[in-house]
């Protein structure tokens, strides 16, 4: 169970930041629904909802929006049109490797991310939409 907890902590570090920032993303309040699959887990993890308010500065530099964790570095980043792909490696207390892809569709996006940490693989799917201006 300890490994599963560490994996969950790693995931929490990168939501919502892991999937943001492409040319078509606008500032404002975004709502994300995340589903996760962990092979070998006895029960499916329920989807989680979160929201985040992104300023104009937040969405200006796509690479910087992937993570704010000082122990993580983006090792590969590509953006073409409305699609962003990346790879990231984290060290320190919660080491892991991530790869992801996000496709933006106006004021929404679909994202997939794969994380490898402590011998486990976690697949995540994120659906997000802009719900308005920041409060």
What is the meaning of each model-derived region?
Residues 22-135:
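Subset-of-secretome marker
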Residues 3, 19-22:
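Compositionally biased, disordered extreme N-termini, encompassing classical targeting presequences
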Residues 8-17:
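Bacterial N-terminal signal peptides
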Residues 1-9:
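Bacterial N-terminal signal peptides that target proteins for export
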């Amino acid at each position: 169970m300890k490994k599963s907890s560490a994996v969950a902590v790693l995931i929490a570090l990168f939501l919502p930041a892991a999937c943001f920032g492409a040319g078509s993303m606008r500032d404002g309040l975004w709502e994300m629904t995340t589903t996760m699959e962990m092979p070998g887990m006895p029960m499916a993890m329920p989807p989680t909802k979160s929201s985040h308010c992104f300023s104009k500065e937040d969405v200006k530099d796509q690479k910087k929006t992937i993570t704010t964790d000082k122990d993580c570095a983006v090792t590969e980043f590509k953006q073409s049109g409305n699609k962003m792909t990346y790879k990231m490696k984290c060290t320190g207390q919660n080491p892991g490797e991530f790869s992801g892809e996000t496709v933006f569709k106006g004021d929404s996006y679909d994202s997939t991310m794969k994380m490898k940490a402590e011998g486990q693989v976690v697949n995540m799917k994120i659906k997000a939409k802009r719900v308005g201006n920041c409060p």
